[in-house]
Structures are given as structure tokens and as C-alpha cells.
Amino acid sequence: MKKEKTDKFKKYINIYLIRHGMTPGNQEHRYVGRTDEGLTQAARKELEDRREIFQKVDRVITSSMKRCIQTAEILFPYQVPEIQPGLEEMDFGTFEYRNYQELSGDPKYQAWIDSNGTLPFPAGEDLQQFKHRCCQNFLNSLEKIRKASGKDEITFRGFSSLHHHNEENDKETSAVFEQNKNDNEAVKTCVAFVVHGGTIMSILEAFAEEKKNYYDWQVKNGCGYVASTDYENGAIVLRNIKYIEL
């Protein structure tokens, strides 16, 4: 009986995980971490042209970096971005804002390549510490949403909002929408996280139902994922993950 009472007040939250648009450093294939640069003009135009793909969201959460805030303001102009500290990209240390050509021949860079990216960046961040930072602050964001809802329990479920011109995807998302619509006592919230490639990779490696390596979750600039997310017994799992390509 207690479970039935609790289930009546579940709050449904759907999420986007979106990587920021292209920056000058991204164009030149540089390691852009702590460098706080904005979007290129071409990226701004591309995002403006494609923002109809995204459903209206209730909240937008970003890192503190210009490139994420600018992307959020273009895609979701009706929402003020909420900055969540700790969702920033990796600190690349001495590799920061340099590209392969500039680093080629550097013994420290070669050692990092030979380690398959597992070594800490010289004078920068360790990969495992970075992953922990991103995941912890993702959870911190969800906890703020839970508290703001005034409910004791949040269940993250089916994502129905991807307006993509793909018949197969449309059928899948429509089915999920019908499933959620039938639960008429659910309160549905849609949250967009506009962050960095490494941040998204960290979150999905940790919480995706489909287990993949960190590097298998790479995402292009301006693209991202939608997910249906369950939050039960203190454990978060991201399900039904679909890639969004602009």
C-alpha cells in the first residue's frame, strides 16, 4: 500500500545532453578545456536554424563556460541558463589549446597517446577525477530538481520530445509519449544539460543502461543525446538513449 501511495506522486523528468556548438579552437582540432571562448558565427547560425528540433524545456543547465551558455541561449531563448559548477570540460594542462600538429614530437604527449588517454594531463586533470567531478555535479543538479519539485521521489522515464524527421524514431518516441500520457497523475519536466563532450561521455559511461567505454560516447559539436531516466532506490539509470545529430 505504501508503494502505491508513493507511486501516485512520482515526478517524471526527461533530459537532453547537448554538447556546445563549434568554437574556433574546435575548428582547429585543439584541446579546448579551460579556455573560455565563444562560438563561431557559423555555429550560431547552424544552431539557430535547427533549434526547432528541440521541445520546449522547463529548465536549462549549463557549465560556466561561454560556449555552453551561448549554445543554451540560442537553442532555448525563453529560458535563463542555470549554471552548475563542476560540469566544465577537462583541464588539459600543458596540452591546453594545442592540436596534434603542435604537440607532435612532445614526449609527454606521446606517452599520453600510448596510454590510450589514461594518463593524467601534465599539470592538468586526471581522467578518473574528471569523470567523478562531472558525475557528482550531474547528480547535484538532479538533486536540486528533486528538491524544487517538493516530492520525495523522482522517477525519470520515457522521452517523448525529439522532433526528428525520421519515421522510425518518430514511432519510438510516440510510443513512449503515449505510455507517459496514460499516467495522468505524473508531473513531467524536461531538462536540457548544455555542456561539453567529455562531460557527456562521463555521465553516459557512468549511468547509461547500455554499458560502453567512455570514448564510445563521443558526440559532435551541437549534437547530443536524449534519454529516459529511472531514479529508483537511490540509483539513476539512463535508458532508451538516442543520438541527436543536427
Regions found by a protein language model. Name each.
Residues 2-14, 90-101, 147-189, 202-246:
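Acidic, low-complexity terminal tails and accessory targeting/binding regions
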Residues 13, 18-79:
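Active-site-proximal alpha-helix that buttresses catalytic centers in soluble enzyme cores
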Residues 15-16, 81, 187-198:
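Generic beta-sheet signal
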Residues 23, 199-200:
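Short active-site segment of divalent metal-dependent hydrolases/proteases
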Residues 62-63, 132, 194-195:
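Short beta-strand scaffold positions
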